[in-house]
Amino acid sequence: MKHILIRSGKSPFYVAPPEEVIHRDLIGTNAGNLLFSDAMHKILLADRTTVTSNGISTDWSAKRAAQINEAYDAFVVPLANAFRPSYEASLNRLSKLIEQLTIPVVVVGVGAQTGVDYDTGRLKAMEPAVRRFMKAVLKRSASIGVRGELTADYLKQLGFTDVDVIGCPSMFLHGDTFPALDKKPQGLTDDSRVAINLSFAASKVGPLAAITQRAYERFPDLTYFAQNTPDAELLFWGDTSIAANASPTLPLERAHGLLRENKMRVPLDPYTWMRDLSGFDFSFGSRIHGNIAALLSGTPAMVLCHDSRTLELCRYFDIPHQKLKDLPADTEPAELYEKADFSALHNGHKERFDRFIAFMDRNGLENTFSHGDGGAVFEKEMAALELPPSIEVWDGGDDGALGYRVARLREQIAQTGQKHKDAEGRARRLEAKNKELEGRVRELEKHLNGSPLKRVTGAKKGLMVRLGPAIRRRLRRTSSKS
């Protein structure tokens, strides 16, 4: 039996209520992370394999590394856009852990993130971190699996050639087959159910707000599927934007129409996410995994690419896409639906799957499709779970989590009070230190006013006479800031 440790927010079989998902951030800030980690979990469950979730945070202590070396035969690390400046600290923590491991380490689906122009210049400063990570991984595996050609070229420029382009494991949830994506001959109508997904960084690249507003006005049955932890917190806790009479242009506050009308959801598990999306006619937006979830459920989708992480995957898998920066503000979802062509996606899927399986074979990993039941037991177990529904807009009533909300608010009040006490203590200590320094300054002035100072003339004397008052002024300013 082979025991595999996988980096993931949680096991697919672990059922967590909304408050736990938010409190522990089990989605790792983005529900898309669970989509590809759940897919990898299923793929790895061969007949002679067990798979255990390590969680999303990285404990790189020597104790944890020793535990992993003792208990597991391999560490599988599914990643997304890890080669980006904001992820550098997390990447370094992963490197520190991997450098202590004596078992194989297999990285799946890692990517570089830059603009749609593929200019990797912004990644220059983090090259040492990327090199360290790559060296640590490749000492423990035959190759590293990347999202697309951009990432492969970037790593080759850094001197790494043991790289396989495999895309994202989420697209192989169903193995070498892919769901049919049938479009209605009449296109989208006013009665069509349309799902939209948004990443707010994309609004700086193209007319995302305007396109969202047009879709909201055009389709009464429009639903916004958000993915990030702050989105879940907004739905779970609410805010004061309605009372403040705010008029947000994007659904970042409760005052937006999509939230006022309870047309926003945050999925907690990939399988409820896909189940929800299976009832829609079309999905579009700037979230790559939001649209992959739709495709996996059999719902046609179109990605509005705003950076390399989305564009790279769309190009590799032939997912229908448009560059957001090239779209006019009056773009209609019906136009995107009409342009969506899934023939290349379907025609090339088996070849891409075979390439993915070859990567796994090269790295000594069995898979459920070649060495198991094709995921049948996994799917049966998932179907038997009572997974919580996607989070909706909280109306202030008793949804079963009122006790948690009260307890959490009490904790935050207590933590805030303790922080104030700690700050006051630091201020008192600083004030005492300032008084001590002022006393030393006075002693210095007395010394300077003695007979030795009389022998000092000219510029040196003026400098020394001004020294005491200048120091006192600096101390007073420091004391006032505290």
List PLM regions with ranges.
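Active-site anion-handling motifs in enzyme catalytic cores
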Residues: M1-M464, G468-S479
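A C-terminal cap/extension of S-adenosyl-L-methionine-dependent methyltransferases
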Residues: S482
